[in-house]
Structure formats: structure tokens, C-alpha cells
Amino acid sequence: MQVGNIIEFGKYDWIVLDIKKDRALIITEHIVEQRPYHDAYTEVTWADCALRKYLNGDFYDEFSMADKLRISPVVNKNPNNEWYGTSGGADTEDRIFLLSMEDAACQYFGDSSSLLYNPRKNQRYWFERKDKNNSKRVATLESNNKQVWWWWIRTPGRVGVKAVYIHGDGNIGIQGNNILKGNIADGKCTGGVRPALWLRY
């Protein structure tokens, strides 16, 4: 197994992002579903959001017992939003999780750390449309792999009712999308979900 490989696990294809000893960090190749980040329009962090509860509950339970034994629990740090200082909340022990903003910006889709840590003087919203690594973050729907969609990151946005996301063009929405209420027809902010996990191999 090597970084960049696509492997089958459960009912999805996953991309290998990192390898440490006998474990690999993997993320679904496609957006496997669309869900709000939380089930109430109130300030929340990853530790208490409905999406985390779902991923470590119903989504995790879809795996066979043999597959569950291969999923390694991990303690995730949840840093504050680098630009806005919004609290990332408590550390969490997760079996299934979303990537953090640092994961997406600095580690697993090329290194754009200089853009994350050195915003321009008046830059407040879009991360960086000319980021050369944007294309590496673009994702399509599992149900229609020709349809590009935006997907959630677990880091909070500029306020506690928003969470960071990856735009359809791969750009990092550092200010965040609303965790529940959106401007689309059903009134909900149904962001794409790309679960990640550490897999024993």
C-alpha cells in the first residue's frame, strides 16, 4: 500500500493519504452523501456536531464486524480557525472523522501552508482561488461522479454556526458555510461528506 493508491474498503473506494507503521489514513474517493454539519442552527464544534455523531454511529455501523476491527480509533486535535480564531473545541476520539483545515491545506493535497498562515492584508473570505493545489481537492458525488460538489471540513468557520468547506473548484472556504440553514430549495446546507479513517492493514 502506498500514498495515492485507491483501495476498496467496505462499499466505497478510498484514497490513501498517509501511512504510519501498520495504519493508513484513507478518505473516500468521492463524496458519499450530502448532509448538514449539525441538526440545529446553533454554535457547535466538531466534538458535539450531529455529523460526527452520525459518522461514528450509523455510518460506522454499516461496516461488517471484520471491517470494524480494522478501523483504528484516533484522538483528533481540533485547532481553532487560523484566520478568525473561532474555537475548534475539545479533542475528540473518533473512528470516522472529517479532515481538518490544516489537513486539507497543508498536508494531504499539497502544501499550501504559506497561503493559510500568511493572508493578505484585506483578505477575509475566499482562501486563494489561484492556489495551485485547488484541483487536488475537487470531489464529485458517489451517485454521479460527473457532478462536482462542495464538501465539509471539521474546522469551524468565522463564527460558531459555520464550518469550513472545500468549494467545488477545490478552493478552501475558510469563512465557512452555515452548519444547517442554507439558501437552497430545502433550506438546508447539505454539504458533501468525505469520511476519513485510520485503517489497520
Predicted regions and their residues:
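Collagenous Gly-X-Y triple-helix signature in extracellular proteins
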Residues: 1-201
